Amino acid sequence: MKNVIGLILAGGQGTRLGVLTEKIPKPAVQFGGKYRIIDFTLSNCVNSGIYRIGVLTQYRPHLLNKHIGIGKPWDLDRKGGGVTILQPYSTLTESVWYKGTADAVYQNIEFVDEYNPEYIVVLSGDHIYSMDYSEFVYYHISKGALATIACMEVPITEAHRFGIMVTDIENKIIEFQEKPKNPKSNLASLGIYVFTWNFIKEVLIEDSKDNSSDHDFGKNIIPKILSTGKVYAYPFEGYWQDVGTIQSYWETNLELVRPIPPFNLHDPNWRFYTRSEEMNPAYISENGNVRNSIISEGCEIYGSVENSVISQGVFIDEGAIVKNSVIMTKVEVGKNVIIEDAIIAENTIIKDGCKIGVGHFAESKYDKKVYNSPITVVGMDSIVEENCKIGKNVVIGNDKIVSANTVIDSGGYLI
């Protein structure tokens, strides 16, 4: 698709993921054993024939920049295109972060103009889904649209979390509400757009001069351009998940180990690519026991794993039991450890005899808005010393050391 540029918005923190995004942005969070969340959007681009891509980063971008690099795992290390990391930059008059999603694109008009595209696809880098963007663009063209928004129906009880649209029989959008208290429909924007470039460029320039604007596509740009009569909805019927909360992130990972998972990581016609460290094959010992789980490269399993996603380079020692959990890269689990209903972030060490995620649910004493499920979360680069007992809905921060024999009751925290 030589007349199309892809712009991936990847600067968000993802505050509802708590400690998982304190050190890295949401698009860089691990998913599915070997991937990072942004891998799915990047892979969708190349599978759709879009090879000119800008990734707009902002919050703690170092790991994301390193992960993407020159784009080799996605076949984006090429002349006349490829992937470019686009961070906010200083001018003679100001030095600011992107003020909103629309401002992020506005600040990179020069980058887009270098390729002189007819259309741009604006994408979120923090969702789990597969979509053929070429079909999306062709739909936009067939409608004679100036803007097209990918959408899907959501439960009406969840509609207040999304941009909600009302359409006519031809899918023309006649009304748009950004996160309404009383939604008029359950047709939700996925934050995925196709724009005719010459049109949206002028709209963004005009919006940049409006001091009352939040410079956001959902809040400002889409409502403003509805009057053109050329803004359409693109109904998407495939799999899409936001994974924006602890609960949804955990659930979406564990959906992958169902007998027939709703999201297929193994489709030979739509592969997902990533940058990952070369490791030896996984090893399961004579006494190791694995049931209904993903075990990634470099793992050594001497204990038991059930209904879990185990990322690369994880070591699980003898007598350990891991159930219903997401274990990220290079975690070490000691002898006779029990981990249940938990997320253990990268490079963390759980020493012998610990019990994590045990007991009964209790409300969080730290942050009820973020930590409101039975899931216990242990941040990256932490150490839980021997024989600790940690309940459900507990959060342990990044870079923490939990002293031996510590008891943290359900709903507790160490930040």
Swiss-Prot record:
Keywords: ATP-binding, Carbohydrate metabolism, Glycogen biosynthesis, Glycogen metabolism, Nucleotide-binding, Nucleotidyltransferase, Transferase. It is an enzyme of class 2 (transferase). It catalyses: alpha-D-glucose 1-phosphate + ATP + H(+) = ADP-alpha-D-glucose + diphosphate. GO terms for molecular function: ATP binding; glucose-1-phosphate adenylyltransferase activity. It comes from the Bacteria. Involved in the biosynthesis of ADP-glucose, a building block required for the elongation reactions to produce glycogen. Catalyzes the reaction between ATP and alpha-D-glucose 1-phosphate (G1P) to produce pyrophosphate and ADP-Glc. Homotetramer. Belongs to the bacterial/plant glucose-1-phosphate adenylyltransferase family. This is Glucose-1-phosphate adenylyltransferase. It comes from Fervidobacterium nodosum (strain ATCC 35602 / DSM 5306 / Rt17-B1).
